[in-house]
Amino acid sequence: MWERIFLAAALALTITLILGPLMIPVLRVMKFGQTIREEGPKRHLAKAGTPTMGGIIFLVGIVVSALVMAEKPTSLEMVMVISAMLGYGLIGFIDDFIKVVLHRSLGLRAYQKLIGQIALALLLTWGANRYLGRGTDLVIPFTSIHLELGLFYYPFVSFIIVGITNAVNLTDGLDGLAAGTTLFSMLSYVSIATLAASQGGGVAILAYESDLAVFAAAAVGGCFGFLRFNKNPARVFMGDTGSLALGGALVGLAVLTKTELILLIIGGVYVVEAISVILQVFSYQTTGKRIFRMSPLHHHFELGGWNEWRVVMVFWLASLLCGVLGVTAYMAGMF
């Protein structure tokens, strides 16, 4: 099992490193350049025109590596987690295409995105229950207590799914930020799926736990490889194509490992980023005042004088700590 996990990460890393130099010039020639909002940090204006939609680069690496190294590539677990990733990635691709190619700055309208995201969330939760017997219960973090929600499970977990995928998207605002934080989140899921396989399931009884670990490892390799081109100063951005796909991969792993609530711990950085936006909007609309210099939170620190690399490193460290706490919460429920 460990051999396949390491090889999955290595193969995804290799594919991403090979595709990067091939795809970036193509994206540049096709004028898939990023537009930068003028109200953002002024130093970001220099990034205008940087190729976007680069998420395609690591998505190819993740999918190929996961399928090649999986014990059973056609298992429902593997099909569903890849479908979740690509489904949300497709929404992001359409959004990017409208913004970059059709030059409609807002991309998909908010309600259009939400319809697609909610539909995918309901399909994922229903499919996991109907075909894989995951049930409609939630495992309480740090315990082995299962809270049965019945039909309420679907809207509740769909809310988490849509929230996390959009939160990952919000986090993709600095060079290397989303790729690095997701790398650590995926490392957590390598650990969780591996623990499930070695301990006979733990809080999640899965048929192909090791294949989910292989998928998560492939995502680690893909994100690590993408950082070669996305670290400051970025040569390419992942775009909504990449950020929504990574969010989809995370929620897919969470649903299939029955760690829907633990995901809120593992993805603590995303949660805080999303909350900062919600609080900022609420405060401005109700009082006319802003809580933060700018939201999401990473821009608040930038405008406070931190350089971009410092913000990214602090957020990476926070993501690592959240991941360790999330794995600890999972392990506590195994005993």
Curated annotation (Swiss-Prot):
Q: Which GO terms describe its cellular component?
A: plasma membrane
Tell me its cofactors: Mg(2+)
Kindly list the residue ranges recorded as spanning the membrane. Answer: 5-25, 50-70, 78-98, 114-133, 145-165, 177-197, 200-220, 236-256, 262-282, 311-331
Q: Coiled-coil annotation: which residues? A: none
Q: Which UniProt keywords apply?
A: Cell cycle, Cell division, Cell membrane, Cell shape, Cell wall biogenesis/degradation, Magnesium, Membrane, Metal-binding, Peptidoglycan synthesis, Transferase, Transmembrane, Transmembrane helix
Task: Report the function annotation for this chain.
Answer: Catalyzes the initial step of the lipid cycle reactions in the biosynthesis of the cell wall peptidoglycan: transfers peptidoglycan precursor phospho-MurNAc-pentapeptide from UDP-MurNAc-pentapeptide onto the lipid carrier undecaprenyl phosphate, yielding undecaprenyl-pyrophosphoryl-MurNAc-pentapeptide, known as lipid I.
Name of the molecule in the record = Phospho-N-acetylmuramoyl-pentapeptide-transferase
Supply the gene name.
mraY
